[in-house]
Amino acid sequence: MGCRYAVLALAVAYFAGSIAANDSQIVAVKGPASIRFTPAIHVVRGRFLRAANTADERNEDRGINLKSMPGFEKIASLFTKKNTPGPLLSWFEKKKSPDYVFLKLKINKGKQQLFDHPDWNVWVQYTTSVVKSDPEEAMIAALRTHYTDDILSKLLESAKNVPKTSGLATKMQMEHWVASKTPSQMFQFLRLDKVRNGVLDDPTLSIWINYMKLYNSKPVNKKQQVTLVSMLTTHYKDRGVLDIIEAAKKVPKTAPAARQLEMEQIQFWLKNGKSPDELLTVLSLDKAGNQLLASPRFKFWSKYVDNYNRDFPDEATTVMATLRNQLGDEDITPILIAAGKVPSTEKAAAKLQAEQFKSWLRENEDPAKVFQLLKLDNSADDLLGSPQFKLWGKYVEDLNLKPEHNDLQVSIITILRKNYGDDVLGNMVLAGKKAPSTSFMARRLEDELYKGWIAAGSSPDGVFKHLKFDKAGENVIQSPLWGLYTKFLEHYYKSFPTPMMSALAKGYDGDALAKLLIAAEKIPTSNTLATKLQTGQIQRWLDDKDQPGKIFKALLLDDMADDILTSPLFNTWTRYLDEFNKKFPDEKVSMTDTFRTSLDDETLKSLLITAKELPDMKTLSTKLQTVQIERWLASKTSPEDAFAVLALNKAGGNVLSKPLLNTWAAYLESFNAKFPRSRVSMIDTFREFFGDKALLTTLAAAKEVESTKKVATSLQDSLLSKWVLAKKPPSGVAKLVGTDEAGAKLLKTYTTKYMERYGQ
């Protein structure tokens, strides 16, 4: 029964407190802590004895003595004439709505401001007593039936500026907003949709958050709860919210709020079932390129993937699977490679790449494709040192270990040869051997290369071309790859014992090949093989029964002039000549025959000159001299011409010391014997080419040299005899021999001979 009079009791307490406070204008109001006070009402005092008595009678009937309540008498006097505590109790008993009481109290009438009405506090207290759950909401609902939203907003805003009414007005204003605006409208009303990255630092955000809390507290909104992140997403979209969070994180003041918002955003996405694939695009990570793993958003996204898998186990995925799905192996692979080179992202890249390789292995991805995805097809300079190459090699090994690949083994060298020329691979091997970090891999690659050539059926001449030796010319021996090739030949001929010269013979003409082998003999690493190959070359010629003269020309010895006898090719040819004569004794060929048929006079002369000057060529010199003499005799070459051919006419004072003088002397003797009617003397030839005066000087000098003294003396005697026969007077000779002691002596000798012959 006491409940029926609660409103009156509250009114009594309310006004009793007002009186007890004497002149105080503030009375306590039930409400949240944020709104602790509401202004007292100013009323016209009057008498309401009847109302008081009526109430008294009713209270007595119900066992409640209102008069016994402190201050009741004075409270009753505060009501207007019509609005006594009696009617208030009656309204309460009949459960009249706050709107009904509002009209009865005529608060919307009069000249006073709403909050200054004499019965405003009575109505507030009545509403608070009647509506226990949310009295402010009930007040606003009642007020909205009597005022437009604009007018009501102005009234509330005006009341907020008055200290005695600001508390309640603020609370009611919030209720008014909740009643009149949707969360989105309120967000726009506060212009928070225009702030963008600075929204978390905007003072008005706290107003909206209080609004949001009040809005969410309403039972009617239980199923449509609003959050800050949902509202930000509505107005700024996902990417805009991300920008807001990232900007706020950089400011110490807003960093905590940003981190909290970030967590709420994750939960918001999870609640809405946003997949990692969708979020990857939202975060623009699909366009991050090589900066993907370094992006703070990537770490954020990675955490989201974990949370997503927890909440949606049936749709669980991995970071790598999503990246491959969104970017494709073609794009993500180079990103991981680049990230692996940066210390800050190296570990993350290695982890993701390990997942990628597992995926490839599970899918039986073609190693050749993986090779290209890893950009190994364009890494010749540092392939063996590349971490990616090692990973790829391990992948091939793991793939080959799978049972389904027992009959489909993948060859590393086959893939390498498809992407790089053998010459490039060879250079990789050589370079790799020099570095400790790659030497093991280089040796392994070298063995694989040999095996690959043999397995592919590559012949020596094929490998010769693969290594580009067919374009190296005579410099092939200088190629760093030469040792690699010779080693291959050793491997090859162990498996296929065929003539070793086939490859070289197809790649080079006879002379070039011979030069090649001779050069190879001088290189320690290929000396032994070169000797074998040279033997093989000679054997090849013998098998073909090539004439020595043909080989002589094939080796271009007939074009070497002065260099024939000093050329290593000449030794090769002489070896072949000996082997030919042994194998075909009935068809023996002499060296002189070859010289005779292969060399012209000029070349033979040069050859003869060279042979005369080389100590170890005495026998050959004799043979060459014979050939030369026979050729001159056959053509009836005059001794004078032969003298000139041998360039003795240009020897000047050194003519008697020239080895070729002996050759010419031998020819002169043979010529005179064969053609006695055309006999030529040595002295006549000397006189013809040098003249008497110059000849005398030459002979005089030669007589002082032991090796030429004899021939010089003989020629001098012949010259004197020629003068005697020509009746050259001593006086004329005196002009030639000079006045020195040697000249005087020679003149005396001549005069004696002259006198003996002519007696004058």
Swiss-Prot record:
Intrachain S-S bonds: none
LWY repeats: 135-221, 222-312, 313-403, 404-496, 497-584, 585-760
Keyword Repeat: yes
Stimuli inducing this protein: The expression is highest in the biotrophic phase of the pathogen.
Signal sequence range: 1-21
Motif (RxLR-dEER): 47-62
Free-text note on domains in this protein's UniProt record: The RxLR-dEER motif acts to carry the protein into the host cell cytoplasm through binding to cell surface phosphatidylinositol-3-phosphate. The C-terminal region (residues 87 to 760) consists of seven imperfect tandem repeats, including one W-Y motif (WY1) and six L-W-Y motifs (LWY2 to LWY7). WY1 forms a 3 alpha-helix fold with one hydrophobic core and each L-W-Y motif forms a highly conserved fold consisting of 5 alpha-helices. The units contribute differently to the virulence since WY1, LWY2 and LWY6 are important for the ability to suppress the biogenesis of small RNA in host and virulence activity of the pathogen, whereas LWY3, LWY4, LWY5 and LWY7 are dispensable for PSR2 function.
Chain's role: Secreted effector that possesses RNA silencing suppression activity by inhibiting the biogenesis of small RNAs in the host plant to promote enhanced susceptibility of host to the pathogen during infection. Interferes with secondary siRNA production by associating with host dsRNA-binding protein DRB4. Inhibits the host salicylic acid pathway during infection.
Name of the protein in its database record: RxLR effector protein PSR2
Source organism per UniProt: Phytophthora infestans (strain T30-4) (Potato late blight agent)
Phylogenetic lineage: Eukaryota, Sar, Stramenopiles, Oomycota, Peronosporales
Underlying gene: PSR2
